[in-house]
Amino acid sequence: MALTKLVDAGAWQVEVAPAGTVQDSLVFLSPRNFGGVPGTGVDSVAAIEAALAAGDVDLGGEHWFISRPIYCVSGRTIQNGKISTLAAQGSGFMAGSIFAPGNYHPVYVDPVPKLACSSTNGSATITVSSHEFVVGDLVRLSSTRGIIGSDAVLVPWYMQLARVVGVSGDTVKLDAPIDTTETLVVHKATPAGYNARFNKPLFVLERATFRNIEVDTWDYWTADSATFECAFEGIRGKARSVVYGNTFCRTNFDNIDITFSNKASEMAFGSHDTNLSNIKFRADSQNWDSTNSVGISWAESGRRCTLDNWQLLVPQGVNLSVLVRISSHRDVQIRKGFIQVHSSSNNILSVEHYGGDRPPCNNILFEDIDVNATGAAAVVVDVYKSANDSAINAVRFEGISYRGATPSVALMRQRGTTSNQVTGVRASLYSANGGAFLVSSAMAWDVRLYGPGLQVPAAVAVLGRTAVLSASRSNLHALRWVTEAIIGVTSTTPGNVLREAVIPAGTLRASDYIDFVISGSTGGATSTKDVLVGVLDSGSNFQGVGFTAPTTEESYYTVQGRISFPTTGNCLITATIGRAGVGVSYARTLVSISNYTTNDVKLQVQAWVGSSAGSLSVQHGCFAPSELTG
């Protein structure tokens, strides 16, 4: 079936393919009408580009072949079909790519002349002299400092694409605020007269949509990129990477399912405000290329990028250098993910900074991520400052769950330098088979670890807050004793045990402590009254703090304090003892106990009266282990 479509240059026949609709054919163009031949292995790249130059393109559910990347057109949509490369594997870097959605690379952007401009952090206006910007222009801002990359050109500390929405003399108004205090320069994002890879004009792709397309290539399916307000939806197939490129800005990737042979994702060279959702990264063990292979690795001055609802599937035979790494990005959220990996010899989730003129890793969130390692794993979570000027701040790992072999190095690791420590990391991690918590030049963290067999060195307790909750420590729940009922003490046996709790061997950590409160009243003028709180020492003798009320005392009392474990062989008991009409006293005792990693620890509350004529009651009692709250 064919319909006639009128355009400025005349008319042509529009084919309605079986996978399309009449409405699609009325709105979209087919490469067939520009000489393209689907399904035969004929090179149709020129026909597809010609169709895109004329309007939106529908591939009609057919299979198309190309000999080089398709250079896309701003404002266009291409949808509904399969595209395979004809380029021979190894014929050249990105020669087998499917699309070129923009084509930034530091080597090609660096020579573009730039104008000095001034602004303030949070302002949407810049001041720039002798410019030619007009409303509607897309501009690129970048800092004057940065790092010199492997290609010997500048990778700026800060980069931003923005639309010009107002011009008044030297004042240029942008559609988004500046997000830095750096010294900036500016230029047109698509400058005239400058070429990039394959000698194609340097450009940024704006407001284009790629929808429901299967890609088939040994190369990256996106070549050098630079996008602004673009959308990639329903992309599937196989390629060297899943989401890969430079300068993805205000761009969305949704429902992407690609089998990759080298990298899961790299977003580099100033990617910002870009969101990835519903992504499946499937490593291809049959066609794996281990050269510089990584999982998800975001670097080079990015910010405000997100990844939601994703899977990273890494079978046996694929060993990535790192699974998910954030470096020189800020304001990143990676949430609701699942990682299935056979073996990992390095880090699974990491934040790393290598110093120099790189932007800091600030405000990084990993949340609700399940990791399943069927073989071996080295480190599950890692935070690393390699240099004295590395910058990492406000990093959080929330709701991370690990199942698999005990990590050979660490469940969680923090590493800094002597003069530049890692600080302020917050985390909650579960491990089904334990693992170590390792710290080197780090402090002031707040970490909660869940699961059996967790290893936390006693020495780190004073450096940060570490809560360890595990099934092997479940008997600590026996310590959570609260009574509001009045207990009358009638025993006249010294050392009468009113309450005992046993902490099993291997349960305690140096960061644990137990708060206690015992309160009540004494009476009777013919008998002493004793109340003590303590532990059994290494010789099984009771050692504690408390009071003995004389025969004439009739009073209300409160014994309130804390039991802590500063070393594996010592217990420190401190208490404040208040008795109405008597005053307040303080008690402190250090008790030598058997090593709690291999021996039980017994806590006791003892109470007795000197004779049956004495009156002693406990009206409130409470043991509250710190690590089982909240």
From Swiss-Prot:
GO terms for cellular component: virus tail. It is found in: Virion. It comes from the Viruses. Coiled coil: none annotated. The keyword Coiled coil does not apply. The keyword Transmembrane helix does not apply. Keywords: Degradation of host capsule during virus entry, Degradation of host cell envelope components during virus entry, Host-virus interaction, Viral attachment to host adhesion receptor, Viral attachment to host cell, Viral tail protein, Virion, Virus entry into host cell. Its main location: virion. One of its GO terms (biological process) is symbiont entry into host cell via disruption of host cell glycocalyx. Functions as a receptor binding protein (RBP) and probably mediates the attachment to the host capsular exopolysaccharides. Displays a depolymerase activity that specifically degrades the K63-type polysaccharides of Klebsiella pneumoniae capsule. Homotrimer. Belongs to the K63-specific depolymerase family. This is Depolymerase, capsule K63-specific. It comes from Klebsiella phage KP34 (Bacteriophage KP34). The gene is 57.
